[in-house]
């Protein structure tokens, strides 16, 4: 189907070209005939004018006999005859127009300086120039276009789009290539060599550390000689060492408690001690149970007290501490046994506090808890 359409279009184009050639030949023939007619009319007018002049010269008596008014003579002298108004340059221009190839381009070659005369010759030429039949032919020829083919138009548009896209892609590639930094071969080689040297040093250090680990760990913990087995064996060995350390610390604590029990004196002389001595010993035991530790850091005081349990002891101690210009920031209470209590105070010294050293603070706290 496409081949048939193309053949039909080519045949139509061929017919149109033949019609144009025939029209052009007819126009040339018409131009030649009209130019010949114009030439004949000009020659007739010239011959007619010469005959009139000869008649006037041959018959002077008639001119003398005829009485012409003076005003008519002046009008004849002022108004030239239409036959004498014709100029040779315009005629030569008309003859030169016969050599033109296209009849519709005559107006471009007319002389613009020649004035318009009311002569039959000029009217005929103007009629020829503005012939409506010729203008219709010219418009038909100019308006005749090739038949519309949507496939060809679509292909041409696709080609244009592809060309535009290709040009844009090439420009982008050129820009990208320009933006890339150009490196010399020497710089690339130097970078490669430095990278190789750094990698060698890293591997060497890793091998040294792995060898040191392998020498410390027993061989029973290393199943293979690779890096993963060495690291895994080291982790297992460290865990076992931690367990052994915890067990040894527990054994040490148990031995210390047994030694303290053996050192308690078993003396029967205590049975014969008098009641006075027993009272004094009880007081010493009570005082020995009271333990006070004070640490001073600038305006902050950490106070730890261990004493026997008494009713209302904590409230009374807090009131007395406030009287000594201490503010309680934090308090922690623990009771290791039913008869003993330990207090942990976090205090802040105010500006009006007279106690500055740790010894003074411990002495004041001892008085509070002994009373």
Curated annotation (Swiss-Prot):
Compositional bias of type Basic and acidic residues: which residue ranges?
250-264
Leader sequence segment: none
Pfam families attached here? HLH
What is its subcellular localisation?
Answer: Nucleus
Domain annotation bHLH: ranges: 190-241
Q: CDD domains from the entry? A: bHLH_AtFAMA_like
Q: In which tissues is it expressed?
A: Expressed constitutively in roots, leaves, stems, and flowers.
Question: Which Gene Ontology BP terms does the record give?
Answer: cold acclimation; guard cell differentiation; regulation of DNA-templated transcription
Q: Where is this region: Disordered?
A: 149-190, 250-285
- Gene Ontology MF terms in the entry: DNA binding; DNA-binding transcription factor activity; protein homodimerization activity
Name the PROSITE patterns on file: BHLH
Q: Where is the composition biased (Polar residues)?
A: 270-279
Q: Which UniProt keywords apply?
A: DNA-binding, Nucleus, Transcription, Transcription regulation
Main subcellular location of this protein, as a coarse class: nucleus
Give a Gene Ontology cellular component term annotated to this protein. Answer: nucleus
Highest taxon of the source? Eukaryota
**Compositionally biased residues, Basic residues:** 172-181
Which proteins does it associate with, and in what oligomeric form? Answer: Homodimer.
Entry protein name: Transcription factor bHLH70
- Species of origin reads Arabidopsis thaliana
- Which lineage? Eukaryota, Viridiplantae, Streptophyta, Embryophyta, Tracheophyta
Q: What's the gene?
A: BHLH70
